[in-house]
Amino acid sequence: MADLWDDNDDDDDILELVNRPPMSQMAVPIKPPESQAEQLMKAKGEVGVLRQKLSMLEKTLREHDDNQKKLESSLKSSHEEEVTKLKIELERLEDERKFMLLEQKHLFTPRNSSKSETTHETETAEPSPIENKRRRMEPVKEYVTLTQNFKVDDGSLFYDHLLNFKLLGSEHTVLEMLDHICTYKTDLILSPEHKIIKARLPLGPPIRSLIFKWKSIYTLDQLVDKTLEILAIAIKSVSVLPENKLAIPFLISLMHCTINFRHSATSVSSLKDVFQFITDFIISDPKFLKQPLHESPLDLDVSPDVFQYSMLDQLCMTYSFDVLETCIVILLNCNTRAQEIVLNDATIAENLIKCCNFTLSISYKPIMPIIVNVTEILLGIVELDGAENVWKGKWAVLFSKLIQNWERSLTFDSVSLNFAGLNRCCGDNSNHSMIDNIISLEEVRYLPMIIENEFEPLTFTALDNLEYWSIQIQINITLIMHKLLHRYRSTLCSLEFLQKTFSLFSSHQELLLTVFLDRDHISDIKRQELLSVLLKLIYFCWVSISDEYKRALRLDELTICLWRIVYGWPESTDELSTEWAALINPLKALALEEEKKYFDDAYDEDNLPAFMHSEELDIKRESAVSKFNNNSSWPLRDMAKYILESITTMDEADSLYVAMVSET
């Protein structure tokens, strides 16, 4: 024990602790300052923590929003179910109320016997207040109308449509004509469901029996597809031998009747097959389209003077192009996907280009009905949205051919072409009797009856219709060019094209103001429509080309034409009214003097009938004025004024005004 208390080491430690200063007086150890890298690392760590907390908060809010949306949808669906149940319950209660009213009426209605016994009493006695109240409480009679639901049989309607189909001007239906037409040496197999049609047997009965059998089996679209299929099989089988040509135009007309029955019933696949089939048929025998422009002096013309075979070729081509045009019309009502399926097919596009080249070529004789078909087809294609890919490189070739047919005047001097098509009649259809005469109704034949090559001259009605459709061709071509220039402005718009447009615009306006000024005809209205679309085309090209292009153009004809539109407005001012009357009245006076000569024998010069004076003062003057200003609307006048102001200066405009409106 003494040794433990005597330890010097422990004493030293105790003394050191006793002598240590208090904690408040001891110096705090100073930490070395942190470096910038450590501070940046610390800040990044804090940012990471904050981001993690923010993401967790966003996740929590997102889950809360999802839960709220689910709750809202569930509440909404439950609310809708409750509303539906309440509506059903309300309808049930309404039915019960009506039933109770009917029961009440039945209970309060007296029997016939009691009514007959008390009739005299009710007539003499006054009604009591209770009876009046009861009478007022009686409900109004309600009647339930019974409507019969008729189910329309589309198949039977389609079958009747084919049975009653006639060509324009014909006395017999097409199927009746096919009842007297057979094949030469060709056996037909229209369908596996039908037996073979032997040669020298009529074609009408098997076609009729097949469609009659299918109309109760298939739906309308399936029936249309099957009918088009058997007609295509018949045409392809019959066209192998030239002796079987008699049946072809009538089968093509039935194909047109089939697709034209109801456009919505023709499927896209059927349209594509019809396009392919008809274009192949046209290309296989285009001799009718390749008639020489001029007769050869070396032609001996020793063939028989008959017309039936040329007539069959003409009807086949005309009806084929009518079918193509109708297919385009149906395709215009389809969606973009269907349009792409048909028109973006390379084979169909190539065949259509070949058919158009045959028709629009200036090396061959122009056939006006078919040219109308081609322009309508191209106008429909250029308006379709799905015909951009395959047709992009083909419009350049067609554009040149369209210009050639655009600037030349189409004449129709062949009386042999005066037949009506399936879509329109470009003449007066004076040759319609030949369609019935080519068929023998007394026997079944594969050869046509002999038709002599003798025709009546074209009537005034036919010539007027031909003029109308020739102007319509130019309108269609103008619209096609306008659409194409919107897409391919840089490649198609040229100086030559613009000069031809100016010349065509000037020539038609000159015809309207000189040759046809005294005429009141529907073709004049169509010509004014042509001038309107030409002006729109000129305006579009004018605002699209550069000033360098404009300086290279010859603008004298265009300037005069535009001045007539801008300053030939009859309702602008009294001064202008006097001036346009001064321009028109001398021309009208010459025509009126010619008309007065017809009345020299019946009337004196001073005692002309009253209608002559009214005609002099009102009717013809108004007709001439409308032609002079081209029936231009305000937008067209603004277009013409814009072009005219960019062409001429103010001094040139004043000089032109003085030169054209001189005092007489």
Swiss-Prot record:
Origin superkingdom: Eukaryota
Main location (coarse class): cytoplasm
One BP annotation, GO: chromatin organization
Annotated keywords: Chromatin regulator, Coiled coil, Cytoplasm, DNA damage, DNA repair, Nucleus, Phosphoprotein
Region (Disordered): 61-81, 109-132
Coiled coil: 38-107
Residues of the signal peptide: none
GO cellular component, one term: cytoplasm
Cellular location(s): Cytoplasm; Nucleus
Keyword DNA damage annotated: yes
Function: Forms a complex with the serine/threonine kinase MEC1 which activates checkpoint signaling upon genotoxic stresses. The MEC1-LCD1 complex is recruited to DNA lesions in order to initiates the DNA repair by homologous recombination. Required for cell growth and meiotic recombination.
Assembly description: Forms a complex with MEC1.
Protein name: DNA damage checkpoint protein LCD1
Species for this entry: Kluyveromyces lactis (strain ATCC 8585 / CBS 2359 / DSM 70799 / NBRC 1267 / NRRL Y-1140 / WM37)
Species classification: Eukaryota, Fungi, Dikarya, Ascomycota, Saccharomycotina
